[in-house]
């Protein structure tokens, strides 16, 4: 190919124009072809081949593309189980044995890959990842929190690790209101079921936040040492005399301070939106938090400052590069990807065909789980390593274009150089 181009370029000028015109046509055709492959690659719709295949997934926490803890609907009720890397399954809560996971409101994957859930008033259950257990089994530790300041249910939990110590912030149902409580500090021995009790021997449970603002807290996430993100909502009557059955609901995003003492967490700053709800608080590895809402989103910086965006969604997932992917409702043909404050709309080959009920990220893949209008179980997976790779159509065309462009430019430079040198020594 190089010798052919060189031959054209060494001919009279009209052949050079033919060569340049051909190259221009190649550029235009390449641009059209690249635009034609602009749909996001690595996307698959359909049923899943995981252990939850055919069952409705209500909540799921991934530790890799093949390992997760899932809350699913079965023929006897709602179960909670863990699937390991090897594909083995351990039932944590089995509805066929008179227990049920229906009251479980959250699952949080800790930094050590253990998963913590609430199992009753003042009670947490830590599901130890097999790699944290000497014999490689899935073991469970039950943590009974101090009830000297009252009984409470736990609706969400976030973790903050600083050096060798860890602290937790929890959303708690105090009976008459929703509150926030801290628990810590916890030593590094909490990883193993053999030493988790001793690691919490000196841990302190704080009192509950005085909720004079009337916020219904729902989610928490770690920001930096001493700072946390929290979200929830406020309700109020739209006009005097309006029905209490149809109040106005507005979303709330707040920055919370807690010093790992018995003192209650306090609200540092609070933002109230115009409408919708915050469905996800996405904790990022750079000590920032992305609050994704149905009518807008908020980025909470490490120092607690907030930046607000207009993009709404029904599900949000962060990948291993701290890119937050926002997904819309049924029929949505795009996803918006946020990274370092920049939004990038990405086209899907076809619209979402189901309502998302659970989502997560493994090692390289994003997973959305839900049911379609016919009640069929559906899963959407996105391989985040596919865009721009040589395996994707767009990546291949980009590679081919760069290759041909490089060959042409090298040949043209080579020929021009030879002519210049020849003219110099004549």
Predicted regions and their residues:
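Secretory targeting signatures
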Residues: 1-40, 389-426
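A short helix->beta-strand "capping" segment at the edge of beta-propeller domains
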Residues: 34-57
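Repeated scaffold domains used in trafficking and secretory/extracellular systems
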Residues: 53-65, 99-112, 148-161, 207-225, ...
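Short loop/turn segments immediately following beta-strands, especially the blade-tip
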Residues: 87-88, 127-136, 183-195, 256-263, ...
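Blade-level signature of beta-propeller repeat domains, shared across WD40, Kelch, NHL, RCC1
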Residues: 333, 337-406, 413-425
